[in-house]
Amino acid sequence: MSLFDHKISELKELLHKKELSVSDLVDESYKRINEVDGKVQAFLALDEEKARAYAKELDEAVGEKDELGLLFGMPIGVKDNIVTKDLRTTASSKILQNFDPIYDATVVNRLRDAEVVTIGKLNMDEFAMGSSTENSGYKATKNPWNLNTVPGGSSGGSAASVAAGEVPFSLGSDTGGSIRQPASFCGVVGLKPTYGRVSRYGLIAFASSLDQIGPITRNVEDNAYVLQAIAGVDQMDATSANVDVPDFLSSLTGDIKGMKIAVPKEYLGEGVGEEAKESVLQALKVLEGLGATWEEVSLPHSKYALATYYLLSSSEASANLARFDGIRYGYRTDNAENLIDLYKNTRSEGFGNEVKRRIMLGTFALSSGYYDAYYKKAQKVRTLIKKDFEDVFEKYDVIVGPTTPTPAFKIGEKTSDPLTMYANDILTIPVNLAGVPGISVPCGFANGLPLGLQIIGKHFDEGTVYRVAHAFEQATDHHKAKPEL
């Protein structure tokens, strides 16, 4: 049994009793990375020397402290688009291949306050644009359940590292499903918080109105622990919400009697695989057995979500990625005779194909003559999608459905057709457009590959999302399954 099979609360208890040391946990993490990361390819950079030194420092402090930090001594992996001071951060792009940040993201600072140990940086799709981690500028991460399949994306390294037992939890970011989809593919728990719940300061931006940082863990309780540590308003991020942070752990009661669950017919319709549908129907039976009731509802504008998302996110990416020009930081071409050539060649050599595709799409959508027809119309549809969710939440506590239409697909299977790749996020994208919280928890298997149940809540009501997810988890054994590597 791995140390990381224990919950965070159990590990903290062992540390407090001095039956376990932080150095033991860090040793376990690097030992496992050495054993399996050659196959899984989750990590891009390791911070071993500093991690071991900090672990020793924390061990020495155990006897001197009355109270340990919320996540005291826990090893963590951080997605490579979250800046870490003096630890290379590339967003998995060649254009940032030698970028060493001079500051820490707010979430990294808050985790340091909670006394975690950063193990290293995790692979992802370049600039978080992708659903399979095949768009990384460095390597493709593999799914620990089947090394011939993708781990999902864009937080593929974050999900794979937790599923493979390399770290007990990780941070990811979610713009259109990039935490929940890989969590589903890898059989772990991933939460996209409400937009504004967690500071984005220090997150390398893809689409600023959609991006949100969140935790990936092995169980729901651990997920609540991590969100507790990173949530809250931040003066460095004007989009972070000045909303009280409740005690998320107090929501994990196991009691969902009388709760009303909505199941969108669009989430069990065309394009959703039979295995995903069946796993959700079985999950609903479990939730009924726990005292909840469910009814079918409609989110009528969700059919426009995919097109709306790609217009808006690509438009925002076009603006956000304009800063990577070869002048201020990152890669600079050697092949330029003038300033215009420098810009063009740096960007064409530094960005991968998917990033270029989305920059071009976004630039087109924002261009004169097309702005009203595309970008402005997409903003109006986004408002309608948000209204659909608000209407449902007037009568229901949560919305439930599959996280993804299918289990993980084979590496290389969808790279030649971007549209089939994009369609993989069709069930997660509406949540980002509406800005509401959503979690994926393991709910079954298809052909030996995990499936995820998506539970969606009202704005700033992660507590109820956690309550339902935890009750389901406690009534099933799906989260206990581990891949064999």
From Swiss-Prot:
Protein biosynthesis is among the record's keywords = yes
Checking InterPro entries in the record gives:
Amidase (IPR000120), Amidase_CS (IPR020556), Amidase_dom (IPR023631), AS_sf (IPR036928), GatA (IPR004412)
* Catalytic function, reaction form: L-glutamyl-tRNA(Gln) + L-glutamine + ATP + H2O = L-glutaminyl-tRNA(Gln) + L-glutamate + ADP + phosphate + H(+)
* GO CC annotation, single: glutamyl-tRNA(Gln) amidotransferase complex
Q: What is its EC number?
A: 6.3.5.7
Read off the PROSITE patterns from this record. AMIDASES
Oligomeric state and partners?
Heterotrimer of A, B and C subunits.
| NCBIfam families linked | gatA (TIGR00132)
Protein known as = Glutamyl-tRNA(Gln) amidotransferase subunit A
Q: Which gene encodes it?
A: gatA
